[in-house]
């Protein structure tokens, strides 16, 4: 069975927040090849919050920190403030150690630097999906 499929046979559902359409499509292709189901794309933080409100049972969110309108950092805390934090993997060019440490300490599952590499995406996302989200 592919890593993107739960033991009950249901694909794990993913939301992608990415300011580059090309990168979002690339990320979706990588995840879908492993059985994940991408259920939505957001090009800015406000769109992601709206999508999250519509899909509260999403299994995982990939979050770029360099989003327009509402950046990924603010978006993370907006979603966290809604209750149970879903699994969130940061996929970003942002690499300030203090920022990343804070997000991990606050419940983000992992960080993947850009440019994205298929092996690294699958390694980190597959590991995150096995973890229980932090409350």
Swiss-Prot record:
The modification 4-aspartylphosphate is found at residue 64. Residues 13-129 form the Response regulatory domain. InterPro entries: CheY-like_superfamily (IPR011006), Sig_transdc_resp-reg_receiver (IPR001789), ST_Response_Regulator (IPR052048). It comes from the Bacteria. Keywords: Phosphoprotein. It holds the Pfam family Response_reg. One of its GO terms (biological process) is phosphorelay signal transduction system. PANTHER family: TWO-COMPONENT RESPONSE REGULATOR (PTHR43228), TWO-COMPONENT RESPONSE REGULATOR ARR22 (PTHR43228:SF1). This is Uncharacterized protein LIC_11769. It comes from Leptospira interrogans serogroup Icterohaemorrhagiae serovar copenhageni (strain Fiocruz L1-130).
């Amino acid at each position: 069975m592919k890593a993107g499929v739960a033991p009950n046979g249901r694909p794990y559902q993913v939301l992608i927040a990415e300011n580059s359409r090309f990168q979002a499509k690339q990320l979706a292709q990588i995840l879908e090849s492993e059985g994940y189901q991408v259920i939505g794309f957001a090009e800015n933080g406000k769109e992601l919050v709206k999508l999250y409100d519509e899909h509260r049972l999403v299994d995982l969110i990939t979050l770029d920190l360099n989003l327009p309108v509402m950046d990924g950092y603010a978006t993370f805390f907006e979603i966290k403030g809604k209750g149970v934090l879903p699994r969130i993997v940061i996929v970003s060019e942002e690499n300030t150690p203090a920022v990343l440490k804070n997000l991990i300490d606050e419940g983000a599952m992992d960080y993947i630097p850009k440019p994205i590499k298929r092996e690294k995406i699958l390694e980190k996302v597959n590991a995150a999906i096995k973890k229980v989200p932090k409350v």
